[in-house]
Structures are given as C-alpha cells and as structure tokens.
C-alpha cells in the first residue's frame, strides 16, 4: 500500500511487570490486523539471551525450536508470527544477544573497527540497529519488533537503547512503541491495580522511551475508570489504553484488539494508508473455533509434556486440523515413559481417537514411544509420527512385523547389531563430538517425491512436496527391503531416492498410519491446516464415530439380554 516519508514504519513491542504476558501473541494479532487492512507486514523477535540460537537449549527451559524455511533455529514466537500472518519468515526474523556479540567480536578480530575500543554503545547497539533495519528488505509497510524479556532486565537494555536510537534516526513519526503490561486483580479487595503498570512505564522512561500505547493484560476486562487512570499516570492518550483480558482461544485476540481500536490507533499515529479490516477469512476460522460439529481426543505422546510449549506448533497444528474438519480437538498429554509396557499403553491410550508422536532427542522415553505406536498399529487407532516419531515407527515395525528383534537407532545404542535408524553420513563428526552441535543438523526446507498411489500423495494432492527438517539420523537403507516386505510402505523419499521421508501402512491394514521424517507442524496455519494433520483429525472423527456406534450397539445388546 505504501506510506509517506520513510518507506517502512516500525512498531516496537515491549513487556513489563512479569514475563509470559503474551507479547508475542499481542504482536502477532496486531500484525494480522494490519495485514487484513491491506498493509504489507513483517515481524522480528529480539531475544536478550546469550545463546546464538535456541537450537541447543533445553526444551524444558525454552520450549520448542521453530525452524524456518531457510534452516534457522528460532524462538517459538516466530511460529506465532507465521501462523497469524500466514507468511513464511526467514532466519533474520530472530535476533539474539549471542548472534549480535558473535558478529561484533568477529568484526573486531578482522580489524573492521580500525582499532576502536569496542563497547556496548555504539558497537553492540549499531549491530542491533542494522538487524532491525534489515527487516525493511522487501519494502514492508510495517515492521513489528518484539523485544524479549521484561523492561528493567539488564539483558534487554541494549535492545531498548537500539530501538530508541532507531526512532531518533528515522523520525518519531515512523516509530510506534507498544507496551504490554499486567494489571492484576486482587480478589480479597475486588480491585484491579495499576501501580505495577505505572512502575513499568517509569522504568521504560528511564531508558528514554515513552510508550505510545499500552495493552493491559488481565484476568477480566478493564473498565473506563482504570483506563483513564493509566492514561493519566502513564501519559498516553485515552484511546491508547487497550484492555486485553484472557481469551478462551488465542485466535480471538485480534477481534479483542480491534474492538478496543488498537489497529486503528496505530495506523492513525503512523499515517498509514489503509482500508477497513477484511474479516472474511478470520470470521470463517472463528466460526469453526466456536461451533465444532464433532469432538475428538488426540493423545500427544512426548518426552517434554511438563512444558506444553515444547510442542507448541504440534498442538496448534492439531487444532488447525480440527478447524479444517469442524471438530474440536482435545489434546491429552501422555508421558512417553508411561507407554513402555503394553498395559501402560492401553491404560493411557484407550480413550484416544488418534495418537501423535512428535520429535525429540535422547534415549529417555523412546521405548514408550515405540509402545504407543505398537498400540496404535494393533488397535487401528489413527497415528501420525513426526521426525523421531517416524524413526520409532520404523523401529516398531522392524521388531514386531519384520522380526528384527534387536532393531534400534544408533542414536540410542551405538553398538546395536541392527541399526534400522542410522547416523547420516554428514552428521558423523557432530555425533562423535568432533564438530559443533549448534546449527549443524539437517535444517530447513527440503523437497520430497511421493509415490503416486500413496495415502500421503492423496492427502497433499501432489507427488512433489517441500517440508522443514531438523535431524541427524535417517532410516538405514540397508533395511528398506525387509521393512517393505513386512508391510511398511516407503511412500516418500528425497528426490534422489536416498533418504526416506514418509512411511505408511496400507489402508486395508490400518485406517491412518502415517509418519514423516519432517516437521510438517511448522508449516501448518490456523486458516490452512497441514494436510497430514487434517487427515489425522478426519481419521480421528471416523474412529470416534465408529467407537460411539460400537458402544451404542453393545448397550442395546445388554438391554435386549435383560
């Protein structure tokens, strides 16, 4: 659409009082609203931790690693951005302190600074600014930057200073600061307190930033009196104080922010040309969210279920599969260890209409994943395996159908006599500890060719697909013939046929048994469910209906007997 003056406008989203307020969802929702107004929008996450990327971080601490098309290992908020914008982002959408310092130190070693004393200001802040302004490539109308952490944290200061300098350099009329803050409700007194927000804004002012608008996160809607008080004490206009209470679905947040007038206020302050919001696609989504025609239970069998964010994209992809089928998906978290025995698997999975086994690393919980897959196969419960989930499916079939009793992965047992899952040739040094672990896996989008009459080809509607990957191990080609003879169909491979990408069981044998080496959840969108997840939920709906009919028939038989 274009803007006046500077080619791109910049919106900086900061957070105050506590972490995990929903800055990422707020930023994503604003981005979706601006895009629905006809503006070209892109987004960036600025993380203050010293890790270069989250690729080697513990999932229990950080949550999932979101892999972009170009192979960058990024923060899970990038997943929110892609899902809400319905666009792919690149690795430059995630900047960490580790990346910034690594780049600055490398420049110092090369002599790029010509003998200068390298300091946080200006060298670190200049590097951050370069990465902020690099988002203008492609000439977006708006760049939304989310600054991680909480205002007042030492780690965030260089990013806040860089944002302040960007405003100074490109003009105040081209920059908008949006602060997300907590307004707690004190139950004994029945009051909502504004003091934490006042202190948070005061801390922001100390670094030279006055917010243009404040999004107030709370348990319940904020009344006009509280809004007026925040506007007065924090020196923002009345319409700039936005109430954003907890919502039953994250996909309702854009509606909440629009009703509060945030998107209209932003485009007004930034002098953006825009149209009214086109709700066609989003309203259809919300109709599916609010009015499901059926309900299914999907068991997600994982190692990191104590932190659901470790599987954020998987759960959102399952829900999107539900939206596509007008079904409500209830995700039941199952610790993989609990499925290691047949009895344990039966107890945990007997009520599941479908089973999803996602990715992971390390030996813990693997036998439980194999046990869950065995249960899915034997009881004909719809199954989808992702990355390690596919590898475990291959191990299960090798052991129980192909008679390879010692089948295992070289990741878990380097001495196994039957490594049906083996280390990729280019990953041997990294696995042996002779190369860096960070950023060295098979990462990013890779093509695959699908067998013409396969279930996966039918689901995708094509025989050529591209999916994102993150792995070091692969199906051992030495066992492919034995696996296929046992009934496991290799339905998709790399274009040269050398790497197994998809496996499945014949539909005459099992209603839906599909697994992939890829991470298809990373390409799913709430408005465009991924074919594999759409297919899984469709099969789950069929399974639930069959189970319901079976239960009804059994009940009527008992009545007749009486």
Curated annotation (Swiss-Prot):
Q: Which residues bind ATP?
A: 20-25, 77
Q: Which reaction does it catalyse?
A: UTP + L-glutamine + ATP + H2O = CTP + L-glutamate + ADP + phosphate + 2 H(+); L-glutamine + H2O = L-glutamate + NH4(+); UTP + NH4(+) + ATP = CTP + ADP + phosphate + 2 H(+)
This protein's pathway: Pyrimidine metabolism; CTP biosynthesis via de novo pathway; CTP from UDP: step 2/2
GO terms under cellular component: cytosol
Catalytic center at which residues? 387, 519, 521
Query: InterPro entries annotated for this entry?
Result: Class_I_gatase-like, CTP_synthase, CTP_synthase_N, GATASE, GATase1_CTP_Synthase, P-loop_NTPase
Which residues bind CTP per the record? 19, 153-155, 193-198, 229
Region entry Amidoligase domain, spans: 1-272
Residue numbers binding L-glutamine: 360, 388-391, 411, 472
- What's the EC number here? 6.3.4.2
Answer yes or no on keyword Ligase. Answer: yes
- EC top class, in one word? ligase
Q: Name one GO biological process term.
A: pyrimidine nucleobase biosynthetic process
Q: Where does the Glutamine amidotransferase type-1 domain start and stop, copy by copy? A: 297-546
Tell me one GO molecular function of this protein: glutaminase activity
Activity regulation field = Allosterically activated by GTP, when glutamine is the substrate; GTP has no effect on the reaction when ammonia is the substrate. The allosteric effector GTP functions by stabilizing the protein conformation that binds the tetrahedral intermediate(s) formed during glutamine hydrolysis. Inhibited by the product CTP, via allosteric rather than competitive inhibition.
CDD domains for this protein: CTPS_N (cd03113), GATase1_CTP_Synthase (cd01746)
UniProt keywords, alphabetically: ATP-binding, Glutamine amidotransferase, Ligase, Magnesium, Metal-binding, Nucleotide-binding, Pyrimidine biosynthesis
Q: Residues that bind UTP, according to the entry?
A: 19, 193-198, 229
Family per UniProt? Answer: Belongs to the CTP synthase family.
- UniProt miscellaneous comment: CTPSs have evolved a hybrid strategy for distinguishing between UTP and CTP. The overlapping regions of the product feedback inhibitory and substrate sites recognize a common feature in both compounds, the triphosphate moiety. To differentiate isosteric substrate and product pyrimidine rings, an additional pocket far from the expected kinase/ligase catalytic site, specifically recognizes the cytosine and ribose portions of the product inhibitor.
Instruction: Report the function annotation for this chain.
Output: Catalyzes the ATP-dependent amination of UTP to CTP with either L-glutamine or ammonia as the source of nitrogen. Regulates intracellular CTP levels through interactions with the four ribonucleotide triphosphates.
Quaternary structure (record): Homotetramer.
Q: Which HAMAP family match?
A: PyrG
Supply the name of the protein: CTP synthase
Q: Which organism is it from?
A: Cutibacterium acnes (strain DSM 16379 / KPA171202) (Propionibacterium acnes)
Q: What is the lineage of its organism?
A: Bacteria, Bacillati, Actinomycetota, Actinomycetes, Propionibacteriales
